[in-house]
Structure formats: structure tokens, C-alpha cells
């Protein structure tokens, strides 16, 4: 899994050299931000069900046809609603993995890769998940550096879906 630190190490190793001062400084900066990222991951995890349920409600509010149209990809049944919250939970979980890893590696490997094909295969609208992620970003309750860390990953996924 790629993170800024592992990429710097790989580059230095491929060039047969030690890490430069700027690479060491960047790595140290990452460690300083790690506490905030872990705080964000911990908070998102402990509030996950509330955030997921709120995000699903925001999707149903903005796209009411999702609860009125029948089909496996819609939330017109209890099973459909369970799938919707499961999928939103998956997005949120992968964001917490990225926070812990300190880079977009988990997002790239487990979420972004193949996202377009998956949505097309299951006839899922990316706009549903964009709305869900925007809701979570606006309502996660984080502040300061923890919010900055989390919001960067939410923006990354939202941009990938847009």
C-alpha cells in the first residue's frame, strides 16, 4: 500500500541513497499529523452508524425516486435500504483506513479502482454516494486538524465519483 512515506523510501532506495532532509522533514510532518488523523478515524468509527443513517436519509431526501422505484439497486424495500447503508458504510470505512494509513492508498486500491465499472454493472448512480459523502463531511462533528485530515479524503472520493 502506497503512502507518502513509503513512496519516499521506495524512491530513495531505487536511487541507492538515504532519505534527503526534505524527505525526512515531510515524514516528520506526517507523524505530527498522524495523531489528528487517528482522532478523526476513531471519531468516524464511533459515530459511524449515526453518520451512515443520516447520509442515507440525505440521499433519500435529495433523490426521492430511490425509495419509490423498484429494483435491486433502489431503496424501496428494507433489503434495498440495507444495501444502501452497507455501501455508504463501505465508503466511510475505507476513508477511515486512509486516515490510519496516512495516504490515499486504501482509497485507490479498495475503492477508486474499478469504481466506474462497478457502478455501471449494478446500475448505481455515483451522485447518490457523492450526496452521502457530502452529508458525512458536513456532519461528522470533527474540528481543527482532525477535520482537515478527514475532509481531504472525503474530497478525494467525491472527486473520484464526480
From Swiss-Prot:
Keywords: Antenna complex, Bile pigment, Chromophore, Cyanelle, Electron transport, Membrane, Photosynthesis, Phycobilisome, Plastid, Thylakoid, Transport. It is found in: Plastid, Cyanelle thylakoid membrane. It is a peripheral membrane protein. Its main location: plastid. InterPro entries: Globin-like_sf, Phycobilisome_asu/bsu, Phycobilisome_asu/bsu_sf, Phycocyanin_a. Contains one covalently linked phycocyanobilin chromophore. (2R,3E)-phycocyanobilin binds at residue 84. GO terms for biological process: photosynthesis. GO terms for cellular component: cyanelle thylakoid membrane; phycobilisome. Belongs to the phycobiliprotein family. Light-harvesting photosynthetic bile pigment-protein from the phycobiliprotein complex (phycobilisome, PBS). Phycocyanin is the major phycobiliprotein in the PBS rod. Heterodimer of an alpha and a beta subunit, which further assembles into trimers and the trimers into hexamers. The basic functional unit of phycobiliproteins is a ring-shaped hexamer formed from two back-to-back trimers contacting via the alpha chain subunits. The trimers are composed of alpha/beta subunit heterodimers arranged around a three-fold axis of symmetry. The phycoerythrins also contain a gamma subunit which is located in the center of the hexamer. NCBIfam families: phycocy_alpha (TIGR01338). This is C-phycocyanin alpha subunit. It comes from Cyanophora paradoxa.
Amino acid at each position: 500500500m502506497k503512502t507518502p512515506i513509503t513512496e519516499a523510501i521506495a524512491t530513495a532506495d531505487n536511487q541507492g541513497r538515504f532519505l534527503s532532509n526534505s524527505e525526512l522533514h515531510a515524514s516528520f510532518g506526517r507523524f505530527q499529523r498522524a495523531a489528528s488523523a487517528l482522532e478523526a478515524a476513531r471519531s468516524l468509527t464511533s459515530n459511524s452508524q449515526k453518520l451512515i443513517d443520516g447520509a442515507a436519509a440525505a440521499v433519500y431526501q435529495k433523490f426521492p425516486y430511490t425509495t419509490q422505484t423498484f429494483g435491486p439497486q433502489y431503496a424501496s424495500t428494507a433489503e434495498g435500504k440495507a444495501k444502501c447503508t452497507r455501501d455508504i458504510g463501505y465508503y466511510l470505512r475505507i476513508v477511515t483506513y486512509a486516515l490510519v494509513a496516512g495516504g490515499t492508498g486504501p482509497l485507490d486500491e479498495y475503492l477508486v479502482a474499478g469504481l466506474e465499472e462497478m457502478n455501471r454493472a449494478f446500475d448505481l448512480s455515483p451522485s447518490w454516494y457523492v450526496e452521502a459523502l457530502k452529508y458525512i463531511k458536513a456532519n461528522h462533528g470533527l474540528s481543527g486538524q482532525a477535520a482537515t485530515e478527514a475532509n481531504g479524503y472525503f474530497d478525494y472520493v467525491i472527486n473520484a465519483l464526480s
